[in-house]
A protein has these predicted regions:
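Noncatalytic carbohydrate-binding groove/subsite architecture in carbohydrate-active enzymes
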Residues: 1-38, 86
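Aromatic-rich peripheral "rim/lid" segments of glycoside hydrolase catalytic domains that contact
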Residues: 33-142
């Protein structure tokens, strides 16, 4: 992500008034299902935490908007499970939230003083000891 914002920080990419162009990330998502590994909801939650912290520590990213609150039946049938909640698969024409996934509490607490508590598990999945190992200038107190 920093490669993109570093690129936009070049003089040739700046606005006419010399300002760095900012980025809005939309329709972002991480699946909790894998065709080869099955349920990867811990990886989904860890990926969101990592991505959120990267965005939060980059001054040129203005927004990070997730794809779905609740999984979509048609996407789950294709092993794409992007929501914070599972969906009732028996109601293909309606979106009925069934159960929160691991990502739900990470999402809920990521902007609070409980953030590090709810993302602690992710460091093992990512293979780090502390967030500042992979996020230069990490803002939260570790």
């Amino acid at each position: 992500l920093h490669v993109l914002t570093d690129y936009l920080n070049q003089d040739s990419m700046k606005t006419a008034s010399g300002e760095v162009r900012h980025v809005i990330l939309t329709e972002e998502g991480f699946t909790a299902q894998s065709l080869t590994r099955g349920d990867v909801s811990d990886i989904q939650a860890a990926a969101f935490a990592y991505a959120y912290y990267l965005v939060d520590n980059n001054p040129y990213i203005d927004a990070f908007i997730l794809n779905r609150q609740v999984d979509a039946v048609i996407e789950v049938e294709q092993s794409c499970s992007f929501g914070l909640w599972t969906v009732d698969m028996s109601s293909p024409n309606r979106v009925i939230a069934v159960m929160p996934k691991n990502i739900y509490n990470v999402f809920k607490y990521i902007d609070t003083n409980k953030s590090l508590k709810y993302t602690e598990f992710a460091k093992k999945i990512i293979g780090i000891n502390k967030w500042s190992d992979v996020i230069p200038g990490f803002k939260l107190q570790e």
